[in-house]
């Protein structure tokens, strides 16, 4: 399935990913940052198991294509657990806290 959000596409994508030890986070970050439309990649490893690492991957760009990112991750042996944030449109909107968020995670 191809995810398109108008002409500007996705501008920020935050993924929870399970990846093997190899390739390294450096190699994975460089591979993702070389995809068309991507301007920056940030990978944080938040858990290490015996054979895999859990990573939060933040990708920003002018035209981030979800399916292209997913395919590259799969080629490198990684699996997307969840899509934690998507921002699209002409302007990036930051999340703001509201009174309803007191018990919610943001």
What are these regions (language model features)?
Residues 20-40:
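Short amphipathic alpha-helix segments
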Residues 16, 58-60:
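Short hydrophobic/aromatic beta-strand micro-patches
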Residues 40-43, 78-89:
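Conserved short beta-strand edge segments in small beta-sheet-based binding/regulatory domains
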Residues 8-19:
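Short glycine-/aliphatic-rich beta-strand segments at the starts of folded cytosolic domains
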Residues 46-51:
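A short beta-turn/loop motif at secondary-structure boundaries
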């Amino acid at each position: 399935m191809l995810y398109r959000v108008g002409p500007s596409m996705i501008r920020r994508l935050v993924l929870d990913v399970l990846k093997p030890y190899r390739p390294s986070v450096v190699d994975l970050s460089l591979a993702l940052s070389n995809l068309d439309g991507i301007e920056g990649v940030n990978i944080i490893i938040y858990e290490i198991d015996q054979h895999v690492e859990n990573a939060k991957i933040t990708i920003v760009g002018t035209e981030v294509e979800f399916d292209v990112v997913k395919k590259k991750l799969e080629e490198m042996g990684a699996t997307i657990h969840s899509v934690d944030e998507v921002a699209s449109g002409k302007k990036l909107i930051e999340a703001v806290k509201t009174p309803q968020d007191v018990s919610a995670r943001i």
